Regions:
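Conserved GNAT-fold acetyl-CoA-binding loop/helix
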Residues: 26-49, 60, 95
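A short helix-loop-beta-strand connector motif used in the catalytic cores of GNAT acetyltransferases and
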Residues: 48-63, 81-85, 115
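Conserved catalytic-core motifs of GNAT/GCN5-like acyltransferases
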Residues: 80-81, 150-152, 165, 170-184
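Conserved acetyl-CoA-binding loop-helix of GNAT-fold acetyltransferases
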Residues: 127-140, 165-166
């Protein structure tokens, strides 16, 4: 039996690994730059998950966890109105760790939605309905906040897009993030 529950700070290392998988390693390496490794980026992400004031904070994360306490999935979400405030920790961390300034990064969300930043299920636990469970728990979180739930999906990931539509997300418009064409989808209240 797998449960969906609020993340804990002590789970930061695993949560960071799954966030990086959701971002994809090519994107993570781009953020780290040519003089740093994916392990360097993982260290930064782990610190950001441990922070309470980061978009990747454990406080913004739901985990799918097995009976043996293995984390097999994550969903990171936050109020879109808080993106710029929450992103400051990433901008500061990347500048300190990699000497790279991302303060001019485009916003991927705005006020008026609970934004799903990262969703990932461990490869060995896929095709069991865990992503759907994580999505449904996050949508419920949005309902409690009186916000629709939004996300960006890469146009090159039709399988994920099918899942989102199946759960009730609707197309809101085109977007771009990290050099990729994306679709903005939203699950109405």
């Amino acid at each position: 039996m797998i449960k969906i529950e609020d993340a804990q700070k002590k789970q930061a290392t695993v949560i960071a690994r799954l966030i990086m998988e959701a971002m994809n390693h090519e994107c993570c390496q781009w953020f780290a730059g040519p003089n740093h490794t994916l392990e360097d980026f993982h260290q930064l992400m782990t610190r950001l998950v441990e922070h309470e004031d980061s978009q990747y904070s454990y406080l913004n994360t739901l985990v799918a966890i097995t009976e043996t306490n293995k984390i097999v999935g994550i969903c990171v979400s936050y109020d879109g109105a808080k993106l710029r405030e929450l992103r400051k920790a990433f901008i500061k961390g990347a500048l300190e760790a990699f000497g790279r300034d991302f303060s001019d990064m485009e916003d991927e969300t705005t006020a008026g939605e609970l934004y799903i930043d990262s969703l990932c299920v461990d490869k060995s636990f896929r095709r069991r309905g865990l992503a759907k469970q994580l999505l449904e728990a996050t949508i419920e979180k949005g309902r409690k906040m009186n916000l629709p739930t939004g996300l960006l999906v890469d146009t090159r990931n039709p399988q994920a897009e099918r899942l989102y539509h199946h759960v009730g997300f609707v197309y809101m418009g085109d977007n771009q993030w990290g050099g990729h064409k994306m679709k903005h989808l939203q699950k109405p209240l």
